């Protein structure tokens, strides 16, 4: 059963980008969008950065060292972004499409669970902690913000990355939380394998009839 029937969704592939300019572009896009603006998905990998969510507490930053710490207005606590992690920003007009925040969170979690199942990885969501887990290890973090009835921020799926920076924090505020990644569970699988499935699953779950690939240029959001 699909959740909504919009006309299309725009897909933009950003490659490897620093966090702050992309975050600002997301804000600008959301502030400027109107009731007729198409929804968008942005696929990006970020240069190494710790981001503190709105609920973030300083004590969960154990020893950030040379990795910058950036305050974010997404939900949740501290997490790490770096190369080899697939971030997908979800900019959906909830009000126009009559989708609740809880519905969207569940759809994003199911998108990741279905994507991992494609690579024969069994995973699950947890009612007490947003995200997706393989056993007790976290493989995907999730954090959203809603403004003017529209979502931004999204998910971060560990695919083939250096997980050691997670040891410098309490991921998502949980001391000792262990992290998993796709490449350790499905050897040989990389970002280029994962992101088409991720998009396909999201589009299917939310009922978009068409995906339109467009270029991304930071200057368009200044």
Swiss-Prot record:
Associated pathway: Protein modification; protein lipoylation via endogenous pathway; protein N(6)-(lipoyl)lysine from octanoyl-[acyl-carrier-protein]: step 1/2
Pfam families, per database record: LplA-B_cat
Keyword presence, Acyltransferase: yes
EC number from the UniProt entry: 2.3.1.181
Enzyme class label: transferase
Limits of the BPL/LPL catalytic domain: 35-210
GO cellular component, one term: cytoplasm
Residues of the active site: 172
Annotated keywords: Acyltransferase, Cytoplasm, Transferase
Binding-site positions, substrate: 74-81, 141-143, 154-156
Residues carrying the site annotation Lowers pKa of active site Cys: 138
Function: Catalyzes the transfer of endogenously produced octanoic acid from octanoyl-acyl-carrier-protein onto the lipoyl domains of lipoate-dependent enzymes. Lipoyl-ACP can also act as a substrate although octanoyl-ACP is likely to be the physiological substrate.
Entry-linked NCBIfam families: lipB, PRK14342.1
Entry's family note: Belongs to the LipB family.
Note: In the reaction, the free carboxyl group of octanoic acid is attached via an amide linkage to the epsilon-amino group of a specific lysine residue of lipoyl domains of lipoate-dependent enzymes.
Name of the featured protein: Octanoyltransferase
Organism expressing this protein natively: Serratia proteamaculans (strain 568)
Protein encoded by which gene: lipB
């Amino acid at each position: 059963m699909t959740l909504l029937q919009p006309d299309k969704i725009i897909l933009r592939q950003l490659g490897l980008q620093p966090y702050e300019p992309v975050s600002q572009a997301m804000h600008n896009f959301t502030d400027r969008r109107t009731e007729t603006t198409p929804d968008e998905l942005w696929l990006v990998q970020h240069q190494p950065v710790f981001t503190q969510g709105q609920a973030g507490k300083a004590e969960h930053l154990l020893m950030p060292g040379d990795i910058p710490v950036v305050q974010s207005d997404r939900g949740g606590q501290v997490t790490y972004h770096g190369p080899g992690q697939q971030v997908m920003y979800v900019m959906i007009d909830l009000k126009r499409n009559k989708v609740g925040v809880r519905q969207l969170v569940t759809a994003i979690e199911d998108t990741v669970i279905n994507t991992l199942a494609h690579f024969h990885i069994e995973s699950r969501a947890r009612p007490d902690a947003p995200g997706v887990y393989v056993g007790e290890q976290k493989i995907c973090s999730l954090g959203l913000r809603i403004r003017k009835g529209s979502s931004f921020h999204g998910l971060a799926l560990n695919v083939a990355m250096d997980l050691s920076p997670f040891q410098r924090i309490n991921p998502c505020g949980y001391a000792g939380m262990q992290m998993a990644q796709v490449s350790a569970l499905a050897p040989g699988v990389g970002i280029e394998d994962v992101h088409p499935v991720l998009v396909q699953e999201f589009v299917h779950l939310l009922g978009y009839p068409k995906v339109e690939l467009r270029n991304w240029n930071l200057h368009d959001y200044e």
